[in-house]
Amino acid sequence: MVATYFKEYDHDASLEDKSTEAYQKVWNAAKAELAIRAILKAKGAKGFTTNFDDLGDIEYNGFDQIPGLASQRLMAEGYGFGAEGDWKSAALYRTVWVMNQGLPKGCSFLEDYTLNFDGANSSILQSHMLEVCPLIAANKPRLEVHFLGIGIRKSQTARLVFTLSLIHISEPTRP
């Protein structure tokens, strides 16, 4: 799985150095992804949630970070996702993903951070600190390892980093 990450995503060559903490974070992210995939397959589930309040025990199961990379990759495959146990967002994401099949780009789990009610210039700034689907990236995602800007800051987290493509919500996107 780690080799797949390095093949599919741009990354700094130093991430491939197995002696570094950053490589260990990528390795642990891969273990988390494989575990989540196994659970989803065993249950026949098409969506899931995570919660950063309970990641397990690093000494017991090796989960030392939020499984953001797994969430990003699984969303790209159509699995519904909701953060902090939000099963309704997971169900909505899966529904929208299925409806979007055959159309360019995709959809993502995001949160409305700022609303600007300004008539014809109204806009919404949407973001999320980690679990954003790479299908809406403007360019090829980059695999990086960093501390989160908010929330859990005890451990660095592997994730895909990218700039979103701009979507004009005032213009129709369907024929």
Where are these regions (language model features)?
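A charged, amphipathic alpha-helical module
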Residues: 1-61
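Structural motif
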Residues: 46-47, 79, 105-108
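A glycine-rich phosphate-binding loop feature that marks nucleotide/adenosyl-phosphate handling sites
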Residues: 50-57, 108-130
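A glycine-rich, aromatic-flanked flexible loop/lid motif
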Residues: 57-71, 135-137, 141-144
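Catalytic or ion-translocation cores adjacent to nucleophile or general acid/base/metal-coordination motifs
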Residues: 64-95
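Catalytic phosphate/nucleotide-handling subdomain of diverse soluble enzymes
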Residues: 84-119
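Active-site rim beta-loop-alpha module in soluble metabolic enzymes
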Residues: 127-165
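Residue-level detector of conserved catalytic or cofactor/ligand-binding positions
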Residues: 167-175
